[in-house]
């Protein structure tokens, strides 16, 4: 424990918080162009084919972004909106693509948590479409 005199001379060092999404440059979202759209496998013990896109942002930085939801319409040169948020079982993927904006379509047939997937509200009285396997 320092003495008061040591604190007068030196002071306390302020801890600097490191951003979890540095490529966004303190913006909530950024627009970008898909450079490559591909699938990758997660870390152990999980098993899947996760949909990922390499995106060049408007600030010229390139990031790996996760494409959430079932099915997507993205391909190379698609314009997307990128937000922060990592995917725990995909190393190096620290961003998410926002569904339902710009060239990214919302998830079709989504009835719950629709706002997170850019899905429109289904018409009242309309039967829910059969889920395909």
Curated annotation (Swiss-Prot):
Keywords: Methylation, Ribonucleoprotein, Ribosomal protein, RNA-binding, rRNA-binding, tRNA-binding. The keyword Nucleotidyltransferase does not apply. One of its GO terms (biological process) is translation. One of its GO terms (molecular function) is rRNA binding. Residues 103-133 are annotated as: Disordered. The modification 3-methylthioaspartic acid is found at residue 89. InterPro entries: NA-bd_OB-fold, Ribosomal_uS12, Ribosomal_uS12_bac. Signal peptide: none annotated. GO terms for cellular component: ribosome; small ribosomal subunit. Pfam families: Ribosom_S12_S23. Residues 124-133 have a biased composition (Low complexity). Part of the 30S ribosomal subunit. Contacts proteins S8 and S17. May interact with IF1 in the 30S initiation complex. NCBIfam families: rpsL_bact. This is Small ribosomal subunit protein uS12. It comes from Bacteroides thetaiotaomicron (strain ATCC 29148 / DSM 2079 / JCM 5827 / CCUG 10774 / NCTC 10582 / VPI-5482 / E50). The gene is rpsL.
